[in-house]
Amino acid sequence: MPKVACSVALAFALSAVPGFCHSWPGGKASDRFDTGKGELEIVFLGHASLVFVYGGSYLYIDPVSQYGDFSKYPKADLILITHEHGDHLDPKAIAALSKSGTRMLLPEAARRVLGKGEALDHGTPLDVAGFKVLAVPAYNTTPGRTNYHPKDRHDNGYVITAGALRVYVAGDTELIPEMANVGPVDIAFLPMNQPYTMTPEQTAAAARLIKPKILYPYHFGSTDTAALLKLLADDKAIEVRIRNLQ
């Protein structure tokens, strides 16, 4: 398996961990961060699929087989699903990653579709596999788009805490009022894929509201990430990182 390069994070509270980087199947890239209680490695599988590695535990978010051969990946201690759409909920990937003791948290609507897992309501923090997980709302607001991710379906974004590091993975959402209560976070993954999620302008506005130290646009499809970089160019408090998360 090819080796991948580590990225250097901000020097203050979010400094990257120097040194050895893991190799991941398919040459998937990762960034590593000091949490104050060990390192967190975030692996970018593609689109909305991520892996968090912390304290010997493996957390998968929206694993989808298109973005990895999961027979070659470590088994999951925890799986988080944001909602029921096929580019986020993949029974084949879940089966490949599951072992005895794997826990899976997801919205009730997605749990009904899949037929298993634990429904996690918004605002209910849970400690699992060394992570603290908080589900938060994710939905569309623009007329004509609300059928994609309706508010009353109660899809999830997640705020994940590892050590002293807080990471917001927004799921499929537009800029919503509840984002004002998400921060402070160190890292944010915000979707940018009109008409399903946010425009670059909405993503920039969400970033200014949440104020992450590092922003990863994800789920961005064919959206021009240069537009987001330009919109946030004058905001020196937010570092925008572009990864292979189309």
Language model features by range: what are they?
Residues 52, 83, 90, 133, ...:
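Divalent metal-coordination and catalytic microenvironments
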Residues 1-5:
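Positively charged n-region of N-terminal signal peptides that target proteins for export
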Residues 118-132, 152, 204, 208-246:
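Binuclear metal-ion centers of metallo-dependent hydrolases, dominated by the metallo-beta-lactamase
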Residues 7-19:
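Bacterial N-terminal signal peptides
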Residues 67-69, 85-89, 111-114, 124-127, ...:
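Active-site environment of divalent metal-dependent phosphoester hydrolases
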Residues 65-112, 183-189:
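Active-site metal-binding motif and surrounding structural segment of the metallo-beta-lactamase
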Residues 22-74, 117-183, 243-246:
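Core dinuclear metal-dependent hydrolase active-site scaffold
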Residues 159-210, 217-223:
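Metallo-beta-lactamase
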